Amino acid sequence: VKDCSGREKIMERRHFLKGAAIAGAGAALAAPAVAQGIKTLTVVSTWPRDFPGLGISAQRLCARIDAISGGTIKTEYFAAGEKVGAFDVFDEVAAGNSQAYIAADYYWIGKHPGFAYFTSVPFGMTTPEWNAWVKFAGGQALWDELSAGFNLKAITCGGTGAQCGGWFNKEINSPEDLQGLKMRIPGLGGTVMSKLGVSTVSLPGGQIYENLVSGSVDATEWVGPYNDYFMKFYEAAKYYYTGGMHEPGGGLAFGMNLDFYNGLTDHERAVIEAACYEENAAQPEEAMANNGTYLNKLVNEHGVQLRAFNDDVWDAFGEAAEEVFEETREHSDLAARINDSYQAALRDIGGFRAIAEIEFSTQRNRVLGMT
């Protein structure tokens, strides 16, 4: 990373990780009576080590678990490829070879399409809306039911906030411009794109840049300006679409082996949940604090051209999304119940936000000249 401020931010996070580890070690020394009862928690992730944004978040979470536990839990963190491949973490943890993974659960829609709803779906909930559904409107119970079928227990441990529409090597002025495009886009968003003639692939984050530069893909979505800046996608694609239908929230999962989870004490569960919920708040807040700054860097330092999908393209997205949701419901009773719960919460929670927060922010931005 050439940007000095970017290096400083990464170094700051590394200092946090080091500090948290020291704090955890200090707590362990202060409680020698429980030293022999230390529980090892092996965590595998879908992101490379020190990966800006998502990877740093995963490492920070593990350091928090160590620190909060007072030495009773010791995490062993393995980034993508260090123990298993990025997309192998689900099976690794389900089999009990590792105790937990940190990932976006929509990577597992090949196992069950219901997993998509526990990351994000097209035209779905924003991060705070999704958190409200998971924690207080029935989402966690459905997530538990879905995950238990694979010997897993998952809780939320992060969120990206609303994501951008993606990086393209040509402008998208009509739905027809999407036909024949090769794009990295996972989840049900990828299924929507497929219905519009896009050839989609789901690549781990660490493999996107090389495929974009080589021309193996013509476009990619990732997260937002803060995370995308360090990926250097601007070296291969100059058109950055600012609003995306595919991931309005981007929730992340801390998926534990169910047998391991059932063997935890109430205190150990509380420690893990506290660390996960703290990171669940920290990650989107970090992105929100930095997205504006890094969007300006992309435009002013690297000549990135911002674009927005027009109404015709958005309408095409919407029509395809309706088909995808209906097909998802037809998969199984559980898929239908997850979809129906999600959609009902979206209309309830999102409906209120539209007449309160969104109306306010729209008028605030107009009055202050921010639009």
Predicted regions and their residues:
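Core domains of carbohydrate- and sulfate-ester-processing enzymes
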Residues: G138-A141
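N-terminal secretory/targeting leader peptides
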Residues: R7, E12-L29, Q36-W130, E145-T371
